[in-house]
Regions:
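Amphipathic, Lys/Arg-enriched alpha-helical "gate/interface" segment within cytosolic domains
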Residues: 2-133
Length: 133
């Protein structure tokens, strides 16, 4: 299988500890809502076109997760949920975690998705390639 690069520069699929996953780099956007939303939409289209089920980790470090950004994130997740067995999120504040978890549970297609929050991307990737939820 050949490696491709996503709009954000991530290799697809990304090999890690004997497994494969996909990483979205949505960090370092600061308060630039338009920038992070634009990247999200481009990554969504890319991921759907790959037609492959992979654990997904998303880096939100140094990006302000406004209500609008979180809403767009939930919408993106609903569109790609059939391709994601597990979701690891990195760089979310306590309040961001609370908001995201609440909205994921409200979503019919996302409520059963295994989601974990991490401070370290390596921990997120290790969990995603493990057999355990």
């Amino acid at each position: 299988m050949s490696l491709k690069k996503s709009p954000g520069g991530s290799y697809f699929p990304y090999s890690y500890k004997g497994g494969e996953l996909f990483g979205l780099h949505l960090g370092s956007f600061g308060t630039n809502e338009e920038g992070v939303i634009s990247r999200m939409k481009a990554e969504e289209v890319f991921f759907i076109r790959q037609n492959q089920s992979l654990g997904l980790w998303i880096d939100f470090c140094q990006t302000k997760l406004t209500d609008r950004v979180i809403g767009e994130f939930i919408e993106m997740m609903e569109h790609i949920s059939s391709h994601i067995p597990k979701l690891g999120l990195v760089g979310c504040s306590f309040m961001d975690r609370w908001k995201i978890t609440r909205l994921l549970k409200k979503s019919e297609c996302l409520s059963a998705l295994p989601v974990r929050y991490f401070n370290d991307p390596e921990d997120a990737k290790t969990w995603l390639v493990s057999e355990y939820n």
